[in-house]
Amino acid sequence: MGKFKPIIIMKRILLAICMMAMSALSYGQSNRVSFTFAWLSDVHLNSFAYAEDDLRQSIEDINANPAVDFTILSGDVTEFGDTKEFLLLQEILKNFRKPYLLLPGNHDVNWSENGCTMFNKIFQASHFCYDWQGVRFIGCGAGPSLRMGPPHIPREEILWLDSIVRATPKELPVIFVNHFPLNRDLSNWYEVTDILKTRNVLVTLAGHLHTNRAYDAEGIPAVIGRSSLRREDPIGGYNLVTVNEDSITFCERIIQTETRPAWNVVRLNATAIASSNIPGEKKDTVYYRPDFSINSTYPAVREVWKQKDVTDVASQGSIDGELYIYTNTAGMVHALNARNGETVWTYATGNKIFSAPFITSQLVVVTSCDGFIHALDKKQGSARWKFNTDYPIVACPTVANGNVYTCLLYTSPSPRDRSL
């Protein structure tokens, strides 16, 4: 049956809203029935020798269980996020005889030699929105892209999440999925919780910590799930999640061995938590937010202007006189007036940009994950020439003695450098 076809990309938001409105009407006409889904996380394909076996055996175990309707994989599905790993993952996931929903985690994007382009290319999108038996499942991607830094949800994923949540009826039950737990370890956790708290979120699911744990995400019931890796155990495992009218139950499944008693129950539409022998949600009372009061300590430093982009800005900008040029992960090159921040010109490449532009007396040279080196007119932003390297470029360009230099990293046996 394969993967659910998710609602993807900003260009399709209007279609997504129409589809969700139809689904909401269906929800209003029928009561929710109980269902069960399998929840895998932190597969880390290509990490340990047994990681592939654990995933394949998990899929076999799920296929053989008639109670399971579909599967969620909540990130870190590979170890390094390179192209070979994603192609192997694609081949393994074809063994599912039931639908699955898939998200990237930090391991899938932090060290990507393909410039974080292959996950979307192979699996269609880094987020999903799907309705099942009167419950809406919403999941968004993780980051930071191409940076080994603190957990972060990319700006474009936040905007996508906000648009989907706004189009979701307030009474419609929602289960939210991300690779990261929604706490202060996530740099922009509060952006997510502020969005989710506007809707009827039953529970949030996360991986990342390789353990089963219940916690509270600013009043929203939240659960962290185990890794599918066996580690010191003889065989791997995952969670079986059953959604009922009045509760959501979490049971650990040991592959082809046993389903253990419920380790967590989220009570729905009730103030009481689970029974004393089953950990329930803890209720925090103080919700923290970033504190920028230090800015007032140094009055000599003041903000002249600022712009907020619709995607992440992953590299430093470049400045030449009164021209400031920066790039973003939507593949855009923006030239601004350095004095007031007003747009001078923009130029679109075909994929993400993680590199800083190089400015010469006449040109702005940019490398992009579309595989091209772009040389733009510095004054007008029009293309003067471009060169195809046939592979995503994440390295910054430099110009010396009339030559452009950059570097390419291939996972094939023949990496190459080129100077132009």
Predicted regions, residues:
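N-terminal active-site segment of His-dependent metallophosphoesterases
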Residues: 25-88
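A short C-terminal boundary segment appended to hydrolase-like catalytic domains
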Residues: 31, 244-312
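Extended active-site neighborhood of metal-dependent phosphoesterases/phosphodiesterases
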Residues: 83-162, 166-170, 191-203, 213-225, ...
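Beta-strand-rich domains and repeat architectures in extracellular enzymes and scaffolds
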Residues: 305-330
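Short coil/turn segments that connect the beta-strands within blades of beta-propeller domains
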Residues: 321-322, 361-362, 401-402
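Short loop/turn segments that connect beta-strands within beta-propeller blades
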Residues: 337-340, 377-380
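Conserved small/polar residues in nucleotide/adenosyl-binding loops
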Residues: 410-417
